[in-house]
């Protein structure tokens, strides 16, 4: 089970994070620019999900999960921001921050289980989103350096997904939780399509 000791979060300088992900000298192929724009926008939203959840400071379980997941998502954002030219960043970053914060705050406010359902749903979508890009790069034998970065990010997103599912417990999702998960999937898909263009 991919559950880390949450008491041992070590912060690293940005340059060390970029080295850790082997992302120092990567040129984004033109065929990947839209995808990478959506990745950067998505990681921005993810960071702000956890910033919103941090406001529910009285819930220790949410606080602990947020502490670990936030650091990983922040690393991903640093890496995506380094790889993607600033001129290619989404013009709607303020929107992704607001939506991410709102999602994190609202879901955490409804309790730990609901927050776990939310994170599991988000990460399920993110895994599929990254896997689509990984498959594309494999198929086209394009930028194996970028491929390795995306694989590492995807693996860490899957860890978050497994963590959230494990913490939620084995109970089946309620009808509302299933509706909420589907809504997150549809909303995430819409956000990706918009961020690819703007």
PLM ranges: what are they?
Residues 4-198:
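Non-heme di-metal
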